[in-house]
């Protein structure tokens, strides 16, 4: 048991990193829940249209996350070594890469919205106005595109701020943006205090405003402070990046980018498969994912913490300490997720009642929530394994165990059950989630083998049984 329980210094380190992230993520997801509830009060079609668009934007978001994460791996290890020039170059790389993705995403989403949204609309279940759902989704998407530039630059900055230990600025900027989003959602969705009643368009406008508030605060907090971080100085004097470093980031980061892109596409394909069970399925999945995200903040926060802690230790060549912390971080993540899983299981029958939708959709959503509640500890372990292996630069392995697994196993199971059997949504969803047990077993094996113990900046690899510095 000692392998899984840390000392006071361990928990102090984790708390210092995790608590600001947890607060930011919890507040953000809670307000997203309120945002979703406000749209959900308009009606099932509006809620479903917005949900489909957010699923499409999810792919874009994960591409940014994967692209910036590749540079972030180097940023974490550069920070561990005290190399400010290296961090500056990784931030430049992030800005250029995220900008490129944003241009591509904007063009694609603007050109074929009917095709993309329509792929999720199928006649089944108790019905629903598919034409209205499509119209609401297009209205929402058209406005959301204006917020992508701010979101892209925020992502580029925040990924580096976090790996250098500056969690407070992103947290403060995020909370301010959340407040703006919540206030303008209320004013513009329902037309309060003299503002026009814009429905889903109001929700989109509020989100876009919040994106620019967040980016403005991030920019002011990094460049406008009296003593900006050393790596910020001279950031925009040029955009040159050493060729060997750019090549390293591309080689190590490309699998991570491809992984995030194909994983997000895989998750979108899962939703598309489930959508053949009708608009009720889309609505129930939206309610489930929105409530689940509030509880997933523990998993996401611990994952980021694992990546930062392990990445910094590997960069500082403290390999034995990294090995010691690995099982402790995974155990802490699993325990915390099990605790919140119990809460989710208990509230599952009541949370869907907050939405203005049918009893059938509420029942479906409650069943999906209970499946997710039971599986939370499993997801926590696989997530901790993913971030540990990623911190060591083993991005090809994370790609195989994450996105390839999603397509080969999860999507295949969902497609067969939905298209080749008459299995209801809940049973199909259960079988797809049970496949996560296979991924957890693979992750544990990879962690125990110690293949992640390596310094990607120096290229040093440490044998599984050897001693580090």
Feature annotation, model-predicted:
Residues 68, 143-162, 170-178, 203-218, ...:
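Short runs within selected transmembrane alpha-helices of multi-pass transporters and secretion channels
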Residues 5-37, 41-42, 58-70, 74, ...:
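N-terminal transmembrane alpha-helices
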Residues 26, 30-48, 117-131, 189-198, ...:
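Helix-terminus/linker motif at the lipid-water interface of multi-pass membrane proteins
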């Amino acid at each position: 048991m000692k392998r899984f329980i840390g000392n006071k210094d361990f928990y102090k380190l984790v708390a210092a990193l995790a608590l600001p992230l947890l607060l930011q993520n919890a507040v953000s997801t809670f307000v997203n829940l309120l945002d979703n509830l406000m749209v959900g009060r308009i009606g099932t079609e509006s809620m479903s249209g917005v949900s489909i668009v957010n699923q499409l934007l999810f792919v874009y978001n994960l591409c940014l996350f994967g692209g910036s994460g590749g540079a972030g791996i180097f940023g974490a290890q550069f920070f561990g070594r005290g190399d400010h020039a290296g961090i500056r170059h990784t931030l430049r790389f992030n800005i250029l890469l995220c900008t490129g993705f944003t241009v591509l995403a904007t063009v694609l989403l603007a050109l074929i919205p009917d095709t993309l949204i329509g792929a999720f609309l199928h006649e089944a279940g108790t019905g629903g106005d598919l034409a209205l759902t499509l119209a609401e989704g297009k209205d929402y998407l058209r406005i959301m595109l204006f917020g992508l530039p701010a979101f892209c630059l925020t992502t580029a900055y925040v990924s580096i701020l976090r790996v250098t230990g500056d969690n407070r600025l992103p947290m403060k900027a995020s909370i301010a943006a959340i407040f703006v989003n919540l206030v303008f959602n209320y004013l513009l969705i329902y037309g309060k205090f003299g503002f026009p009643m814009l429905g889903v368009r109001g929700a989109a406008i509020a989100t876009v405003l919040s994106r620019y508030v967040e980016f403005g605060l991030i920019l002011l907090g990094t460049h406008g402070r009296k003593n900006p971080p050393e790596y910020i100085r001279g950031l925009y004097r040029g955009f040159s990046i050493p060729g060997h470093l750019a090549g390293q980031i591309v080689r190590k980061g490309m699998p991570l980018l491809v992984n995030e892109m194909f994983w997000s596409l895989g998750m979108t394909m899962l939703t598309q498969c489930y959508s053949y069970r009708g608009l009720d399925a889309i609505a129930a999945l939206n309610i489930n994912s929105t409530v689940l995200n509030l509880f997933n903040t523990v998993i996401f926060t611990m994952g980021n913490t694992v990546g930062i802690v392990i990445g910094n230790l590997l960069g500082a060549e403290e390999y034995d300490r990294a090995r010691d912390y690995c099982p402790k971080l995974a155990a802490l993540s699993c325990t915390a997720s099990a605790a919140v899983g119990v809460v989710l299981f208990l509230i599952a029958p009541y949370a869907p009642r907050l939405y203005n939708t049918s009893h059938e959709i509420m029942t479906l959503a409650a069943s999906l929530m209970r499946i997710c509640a039971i599986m939370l500890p499993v997801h926590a372990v696989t997530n901790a394994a993913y971030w540990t292996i990623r911190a060591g630069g083993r991005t090809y392995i994370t790609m195989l165990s994450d996105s390839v697994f999603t397509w080969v196993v999860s999507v295949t199971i969902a497609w067969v059950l939905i298209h080749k059997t008459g299995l209801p949504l809940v049973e199909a969803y259960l079988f797809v989630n049970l496949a996560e047990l296979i991924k957890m077993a693979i992750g544990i094996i990879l962690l125990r083998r110690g293949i992640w113990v390596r310094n990607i900046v120096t290229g040093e690899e440490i044998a599984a049984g050897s001693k580090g510095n």
